[in-house]
C-alpha cells in the first residue's frame, strides 16, 4: 500500500495542517478521526488494514485529516461562540483548502476529479455527516458510524447561526424542497450505522431523530441499527466497514 505524508499551510486555521494519503488511485475518501483525534489514527487503530482490500485494488484513496476538536467541540469550559467559530474555521479549511488538495492528488492519480466520500466514527461520524449534508456538491457519499447528530451535549441550550449550521437535525428540516441539494441527496449514497450496546445509548436518540427527518424529507440516507451487544468501540467499527463499503462503492 502506498502511503504519503503531507503538510500544508491553512489560511483559515493559521497553522500547518497534516494529513496522510493511503493508496495510489480510486475514489477519494476523507477520514475524520474521533474526538480530538489525529490524522494518524486511521493507521494507529488499524483501519488501514480493514480498508486495505479496497485501497490496494485501486478502488479508493483515503485521505486522513486532522481535527481541532480540543479547540472547538471538546473545549467545554471555553466561550461557546469562540468554540463554534473555531469549528467553522476547520470546516472552511476542509471545504476550501483540503478538498482542492484532494482533487489535485486525485486528478494526478485518476485523470479526473470526482466527489469525495466522508468517513468517520464517533465524533468523526458527526463531522462526516455534517460535511456531507452541508456540502453534497463536494461530498457525494457518507459513511458515518456511531455518531451524534445534534450538539446539545456540547453546547447545551446555546444556539447561534454557526451552531445551527453545524447541526443536521436543526438545518435539514428547514431545507426547502426545491433546493438543489435535495436532488443531490437523492442521487447519492449515504449510510449511518450504530450499535445499541454499551456507550451507544446516548447517541441513539439523535440518530433516530435524523432517521425520521431524512424519511420525512425524502433523503435516502440508509440507517442501520446493530444489536444490543454492539458497543461503541473500534472492533465493531472494523466489522461495519466491509459490511457496507461495497454497497457505497457499487
For the regions a language model picked out, list residue spans one by one:
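Non-catalytic cap/lid and distal C-terminal segments of serine-dependent acyl enzymes
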Residues: 1-250
Amino acid at each position: 500500500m502506498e502511503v504519503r505524508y503531507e503538510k500544508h499551510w491553512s489560511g483559515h486555521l493559521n497553522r500547518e495542517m497534516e494529513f496522510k494519503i493511503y493508496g495510489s488511485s480510486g475514489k477519494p475518501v476523507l477520514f475524520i478521526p474521533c474526538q480530538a483525534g489525529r490524522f494518524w489514527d486511521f493507521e494507529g487503530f488499524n483501519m488501514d488494514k480493514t480498508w486495505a482490500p479496497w485501497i490496494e485494488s485501486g478502488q479508493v484513496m483515503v485521505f486522513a485529516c486532522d481535527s481541532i476538536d480540543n479547540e472547538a467541540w471538546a473545549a467545554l469550559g471555553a466561550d461557546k461562540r469562540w468554540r463554534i467559530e473555531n469549528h467553522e474555521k476547520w470546516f472552511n479549511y476542509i471545504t476550501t483548502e483540503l478538498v482542492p488538495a484532494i482533487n489535485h492528488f486525485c486528478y494526478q492519480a485518476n485523470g479526473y476529479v470526482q466527489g469525495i466520500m466522508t468517513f468517520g466514527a464517533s465524533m468523526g461520524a458527526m463531522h462526516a455527516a455534517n460535511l456531507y449534508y452541508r456540502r453534497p456538491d463536494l461530498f457525494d457519499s457518507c459513511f458515518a458510524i456511531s455518531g451524534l447528530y445534534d450538539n446539545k451535549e456540547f453546547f447545551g441550550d446555546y444556539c447561534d447561526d454557526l451552531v445551527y449550521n453545524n447541526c443536521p437535525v436543526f438545518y435539514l428540516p428547514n431545507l426547502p424542497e426545491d433546493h438543489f441539494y435535495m436532488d443531490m441527496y437523492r442521487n447519492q449514497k449515504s449510510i449511518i450505522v450504530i450499535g445499541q450496546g454499551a456507550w451507544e445509548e446516548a447517541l441513539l436518540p439523535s440518530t433516530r431523530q435524523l432517521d425520521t427527518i431524512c424519511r420525512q424529507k425524502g433523503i435516502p440516507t440508509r440507517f442501520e441499527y446493530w444489536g444490543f451487544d454492539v458497543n461503541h468501540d473500534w472492533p465493531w467499527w472494523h466489522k461495519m466497514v466491509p459490511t457496507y463499503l461495497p454497497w457505497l462503492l457499487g
